[in-house]
Amino acid sequence: MLRVAIGLMILAGMTVADSYTDSIRAWQQKRDARLRSQDGWLTLVGLFWLKPGDNTIGSADSNDFVLPKGAPARLGRLRLTHLQLQGDRVTFLKPDGSSQELSYSDEKPDVVRAGSISFFVMKRGDKLAVRVKDSASAVLKNFEGMKYFPVNPELHFEATLIPDPKKIPILNILGQTELEDSPGRVEFSYKGEKYGLRPIYEDDTLYFLFKDPTNKTQTYQAGRMLNTPLPVNGKVDLDFNHSYNPPCTFTPYATCPLPPKENALPFPVEAGEMRYKNGHADYTASLR
Protein backbone atom coordinates (compact mmCIF):
# COMPACT_ATOMS: atom_id res chain seq x y z
CA MET A 1 0.00 0.00 0.00
CA LEU A 2 2.87 2.34 0.88
CA ARG A 3 4.48 1.68 -2.49
CA VAL A 4 1.22 2.55 -4.24
CA ALA A 5 0.95 5.81 -2.29
CA ILE A 6 4.55 6.75 -3.09
CA GLY A 7 3.98 5.91 -6.75
CA LEU A 8 0.89 8.13 -6.88
CA MET A 9 2.81 11.01 -5.25
CA ILE A 10 5.63 10.69 -7.80
CA LEU A 11 3.11 10.56 -10.65
CA ALA A 12 1.34 13.66 -9.32
CA GLY A 13 4.65 15.51 -9.14
CA MET A 14 5.52 14.52 -12.69
CA THR A 15 2.08 15.66 -13.88
CA VAL A 16 2.52 19.11 -12.30
CA ALA A 17 6.02 19.44 -13.80
CA ASP A 18 4.79 18.36 -17.23
CA SER A 19 1.90 20.82 -17.03
CA TYR A 20 4.29 23.67 -16.19
CA THR A 21 6.63 22.72 -19.03
CA ASP A 22 3.67 22.57 -21.41
CA SER A 23 2.62 26.08 -20.37
CA ILE A 24 6.10 27.42 -21.16
CA ARG A 25 6.10 25.63 -24.52
CA ALA A 26 2.72 27.20 -25.29
CA TRP A 27 4.13 30.65 -24.46
CA GLN A 28 7.09 29.99 -26.78
CA GLN A 29 4.73 29.02 -29.60
CA LYS A 30 2.72 32.23 -29.15
CA ARG A 31 5.93 34.23 -29.16
CA ASP A 32 6.97 32.55 -32.42
CA ALA A 33 3.59 33.30 -33.99
CA ARG A 34 3.84 36.97 -33.01
CA LEU A 35 7.33 37.23 -34.49
CA ARG A 36 6.15 35.64 -37.74
CA SER A 37 3.09 37.89 -38.05
CA GLN A 38 2.74 40.15 -41.09
CA ASP A 39 3.38 43.29 -39.03
CA GLY A 40 5.71 41.93 -36.34
CA TRP A 41 9.23 43.05 -35.51
CA LEU A 42 10.72 40.91 -38.29
CA THR A 43 9.02 43.13 -40.87
CA LEU A 44 10.75 46.33 -39.73
CA VAL A 45 12.79 47.72 -42.65
CA GLY A 46 13.16 51.44 -42.07
CA LEU A 47 13.23 54.29 -39.58
CA PHE A 48 13.33 57.89 -40.81
CA TRP A 49 13.31 61.11 -38.81
CA LEU A 50 10.98 63.85 -40.00
CA LYS A 51 12.34 67.33 -40.56
CA PRO A 52 10.12 70.44 -40.67
CA GLY A 53 8.45 70.96 -44.02
CA ASP A 54 8.10 68.39 -46.79
CA ASN A 55 9.79 64.97 -46.70
CA THR A 56 9.47 62.94 -49.91
CA ILE A 57 8.95 59.20 -49.62
CA GLY A 58 9.09 56.38 -52.18
CA SER A 59 11.41 53.75 -53.64
CA ALA A 60 13.30 56.12 -55.96
CA ASP A 61 16.76 57.03 -54.70
CA SER A 62 16.03 60.74 -55.01
CA ASN A 63 13.49 60.62 -52.16
CA ASP A 64 14.31 61.88 -48.69
CA PHE A 65 13.01 58.57 -47.33
CA VAL A 66 13.86 55.65 -49.62
CA LEU A 67 11.53 52.66 -49.33
CA PRO A 68 12.34 49.06 -50.37
CA LYS A 69 11.98 48.14 -54.01
CA GLY A 70 8.41 47.26 -54.86
CA ALA A 71 6.97 50.41 -53.34
CA PRO A 72 5.91 53.22 -55.70
CA ALA A 73 8.82 55.36 -56.88
CA ARG A 74 7.01 58.50 -55.69
CA LEU A 75 4.61 57.56 -52.93
CA GLY A 76 4.09 61.11 -51.72
CA ARG A 77 5.26 63.75 -49.26
CA LEU A 78 5.10 63.87 -45.49
CA ARG A 79 4.71 67.45 -44.30
CA LEU A 80 5.68 68.26 -40.72
CA THR A 81 4.12 71.47 -39.44
CA HIS A 82 4.62 72.87 -35.97
CA LEU A 83 1.49 74.51 -34.55
CA GLN A 84 2.05 76.62 -31.46
CA LEU A 85 -1.02 75.42 -29.57
CA GLN A 86 -1.79 72.02 -31.10
CA GLY A 87 1.79 70.77 -31.37
CA ASP A 88 3.24 68.98 -34.39
CA ARG A 89 1.01 67.97 -37.29
CA VAL A 90 1.96 65.45 -39.97
CA THR A 91 0.12 65.49 -43.30
CA PHE A 92 0.54 62.87 -46.02
CA LEU A 93 0.31 64.54 -49.45
CA LYS A 94 -0.43 62.08 -52.25
CA PRO A 95 0.56 62.47 -55.93
CA ASP A 96 -3.11 62.77 -56.93
CA GLY A 97 -3.47 65.95 -54.87
CA SER A 98 -5.37 64.41 -51.97
CA SER A 99 -4.05 64.55 -48.42
CA GLN A 100 -4.47 62.84 -45.06
CA GLU A 101 -3.54 64.07 -41.61
CA LEU A 102 -1.72 61.25 -39.81
CA SER A 103 -2.31 60.55 -36.14
CA TYR A 104 0.78 59.35 -34.27
CA SER A 105 -0.78 58.23 -31.01
CA ASP A 106 0.97 55.26 -29.39
CA GLU A 107 -2.32 53.39 -29.08
CA LYS A 108 -3.44 53.49 -32.71
CA PRO A 109 -1.41 55.49 -35.22
CA ASP A 110 -2.68 55.91 -38.77
CA VAL A 111 -1.05 53.40 -41.12
CA VAL A 112 -0.37 54.06 -44.81
CA ARG A 113 -0.12 50.94 -47.01
CA ALA A 114 1.32 50.37 -50.48
CA GLY A 115 1.47 46.69 -51.43
CA SER A 116 3.60 44.83 -48.88
CA ILE A 117 4.97 48.14 -47.54
CA SER A 118 3.34 50.05 -44.70
CA PHE A 119 4.43 52.98 -42.58
CA PHE A 120 3.25 55.12 -39.70
CA VAL A 121 4.49 58.08 -37.69
CA MET A 122 5.66 57.67 -34.11
CA LYS A 123 7.07 59.95 -31.43
CA ARG A 124 10.32 59.31 -29.57
CA GLY A 125 11.23 61.94 -27.04
CA ASP A 126 10.66 65.28 -28.76
CA LYS A 127 11.18 63.87 -32.26
CA LEU A 128 8.85 62.35 -34.84
CA ALA A 129 9.89 59.41 -36.98
CA VAL A 130 8.46 57.26 -39.76
CA ARG A 131 8.55 53.53 -39.04
CA VAL A 132 8.45 51.35 -42.16
CA LYS A 133 7.42 47.69 -42.34
CA ASP A 134 7.48 45.18 -45.19
CA SER A 135 5.44 41.99 -44.86
CA ALA A 136 7.73 40.46 -47.51
CA SER A 137 10.97 41.35 -45.71
CA ALA A 138 13.97 39.04 -46.06
CA VAL A 139 14.37 38.91 -42.28
CA LEU A 140 10.87 37.47 -41.93
CA LYS A 141 11.31 35.05 -44.83
CA ASN A 142 14.61 33.75 -43.46
CA PHE A 143 13.56 33.54 -39.81
CA GLU A 144 14.58 30.19 -38.35
CA GLY A 145 12.85 30.47 -34.99
CA MET A 146 14.24 31.15 -31.54
CA LYS A 147 16.22 28.81 -29.33
CA TYR A 148 15.49 28.55 -25.61
CA PHE A 149 17.22 27.39 -22.50
CA PRO A 150 15.71 24.19 -21.05
CA VAL A 151 12.67 25.03 -18.94
CA ASN A 152 13.92 25.76 -15.42
CA PRO A 153 11.26 25.84 -12.66
CA GLU A 154 13.91 27.09 -10.20
CA LEU A 155 13.84 30.43 -12.02
CA HIS A 156 10.11 30.87 -11.44
CA PHE A 157 9.48 32.94 -8.31
CA GLU A 158 6.69 34.27 -6.17
CA ALA A 159 8.31 37.66 -5.76
CA THR A 160 7.31 40.53 -3.51
CA LEU A 161 6.69 44.12 -4.57
CA ILE A 162 8.32 46.60 -2.20
CA PRO A 163 6.27 49.74 -2.95
CA ASP A 164 8.35 52.76 -3.90
CA PRO A 165 6.44 54.51 -6.69
CA LYS A 166 8.48 57.02 -8.66
CA LYS A 167 9.58 57.94 -12.15
CA ILE A 168 12.87 56.42 -13.27
CA PRO A 169 15.02 57.33 -16.29
CA ILE A 170 15.07 54.74 -19.08
CA LEU A 171 17.69 55.18 -21.80
CA ASN A 172 17.00 53.91 -25.31
CA ILE A 173 19.44 52.96 -28.05
CA LEU A 174 19.06 56.39 -29.65
CA GLY A 175 20.57 57.97 -26.56
CA GLN A 176 17.22 59.44 -25.53
CA THR A 177 16.04 59.24 -21.92
CA GLU A 178 12.39 58.95 -20.94
CA LEU A 179 10.99 59.11 -17.42
CA GLU A 180 8.80 56.05 -16.80
CA ASP A 181 6.54 55.18 -13.89
CA SER A 182 7.82 52.39 -11.64
CA PRO A 183 5.73 50.94 -8.79
CA GLY A 184 8.74 49.91 -6.70
CA ARG A 185 11.27 47.13 -6.36
CA VAL A 186 10.35 43.48 -6.96
CA GLU A 187 12.37 41.21 -4.68
CA PHE A 188 12.93 37.44 -4.75
CA SER A 189 15.27 34.90 -3.18
CA TYR A 190 17.47 32.53 -5.17
CA LYS A 191 19.93 30.04 -3.69
CA GLY A 192 19.82 31.73 -0.32
CA GLU A 193 20.42 35.27 -1.63
CA LYS A 194 17.94 38.10 -2.06
CA TYR A 195 17.77 40.01 -5.35
CA GLY A 196 15.59 42.74 -6.76
CA LEU A 197 14.55 44.35 -10.03
CA ARG A 198 12.73 47.59 -10.68
CA PRO A 199 10.01 47.27 -13.34
CA ILE A 200 8.09 49.90 -15.26
CA TYR A 201 4.62 49.54 -16.75
CA GLU A 202 3.69 48.26 -20.20
CA ASP A 203 -0.04 48.19 -20.86
CA ASP A 204 -1.54 46.09 -18.05
CA THR A 205 1.72 44.33 -17.09
CA LEU A 206 4.92 44.93 -15.20
CA TYR A 207 7.76 45.32 -17.68
CA PHE A 208 11.25 44.24 -16.62
CA LEU A 209 14.41 45.21 -18.51
CA PHE A 210 17.33 43.26 -17.11
CA LYS A 211 20.90 42.12 -17.69
CA ASP A 212 22.79 39.08 -16.41
CA PRO A 213 26.07 37.26 -17.14
CA THR A 214 24.51 35.18 -19.95
CA ASN A 215 24.56 38.37 -22.06
CA LYS A 216 28.26 37.78 -22.70
CA THR A 217 27.84 34.74 -24.93
CA GLN A 218 24.42 33.08 -24.59
CA THR A 219 21.81 35.83 -24.74
CA TYR A 220 21.51 39.22 -26.42
CA GLN A 221 24.32 41.52 -25.35
CA ALA A 222 22.13 44.49 -24.41
CA GLY A 223 19.88 42.45 -22.11
CA ARG A 224 16.45 40.88 -22.22
CA MET A 225 12.86 41.70 -21.35
CA LEU A 226 10.15 40.10 -19.24
CA ASN A 227 6.48 40.89 -18.66
CA THR A 228 4.49 39.73 -15.65
CA PRO A 229 0.91 40.21 -14.50
CA LEU A 230 0.34 43.15 -12.17
CA PRO A 231 0.87 42.38 -8.46
CA VAL A 232 -1.85 40.58 -6.53
CA ASN A 233 -1.80 41.29 -2.80
CA GLY A 234 1.77 42.50 -3.15
CA LYS A 235 2.97 39.33 -4.89
CA VAL A 236 4.42 39.13 -8.41
CA ASP A 237 4.52 35.98 -10.56
CA LEU A 238 8.11 36.41 -11.80
CA ASP A 239 9.06 33.70 -14.30
CA PHE A 240 12.36 34.10 -16.13
CA ASN A 241 11.35 31.27 -18.46
CA HIS A 242 9.28 34.00 -20.16
CA SER A 243 12.34 36.18 -20.82
CA TYR A 244 12.65 37.34 -24.41
CA ASN A 245 14.95 39.33 -26.67
CA PRO A 246 14.35 43.00 -27.51
CA PRO A 247 13.42 43.87 -31.10
CA CYS A 248 16.95 45.19 -31.66
CA THR A 249 17.97 41.54 -31.85
CA PHE A 250 16.38 41.37 -35.29
CA THR A 251 16.66 44.84 -36.80
CA PRO A 252 18.67 48.07 -36.61
CA TYR A 253 15.42 50.02 -37.02
CA ALA A 254 13.97 49.46 -33.54
CA THR A 255 14.28 51.97 -30.69
CA CYS A 256 14.78 49.59 -27.79
CA PRO A 257 14.90 50.69 -24.16
CA LEU A 258 17.95 49.57 -22.18
CA PRO A 259 17.96 48.03 -18.69
CA PRO A 260 18.58 50.49 -15.86
CA LYS A 261 21.86 49.89 -14.04
CA GLU A 262 20.08 48.60 -10.92
CA ASN A 263 18.55 45.77 -13.00
CA ALA A 264 21.84 43.94 -13.55
CA LEU A 265 21.63 40.52 -11.89
CA PRO A 266 24.94 38.93 -10.78
CA PHE A 267 23.90 35.33 -11.48
CA PRO A 268 23.32 33.76 -14.92
CA VAL A 269 19.63 33.63 -15.82
CA GLU A 270 19.68 30.44 -17.88
CA ALA A 271 16.02 30.53 -18.82
CA GLY A 272 13.97 31.98 -21.65
CA GLU A 273 15.18 33.02 -25.07
CA MET A 274 18.78 32.63 -26.15
CA ARG A 275 20.71 34.83 -28.57
CA TYR A 276 19.40 34.62 -32.15
CA LYS A 277 22.22 33.31 -34.34
CA ASN A 278 21.21 35.48 -37.30
CA GLY A 279 20.47 38.45 -35.10
CA HIS A 280 21.53 42.04 -35.50
CA ALA A 281 24.76 42.95 -33.71
CA ASP A 282 24.57 44.87 -30.46
CA TYR A 283 25.51 48.49 -31.04
CA THR A 284 24.41 49.90 -27.69
CA ALA A 285 27.65 49.50 -25.72
CA SER A 286 28.59 53.16 -26.13
CA LEU A 287 25.31 54.19 -24.50
CA ARG A 288 25.62 52.05 -21.38
What do the PLM-derived regions correspond to, one by one?
Residues M1-G7:
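Sec-dependent signal peptide recognition
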Residues D18-F48:
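N-terminal pre-domain segments of enzymes
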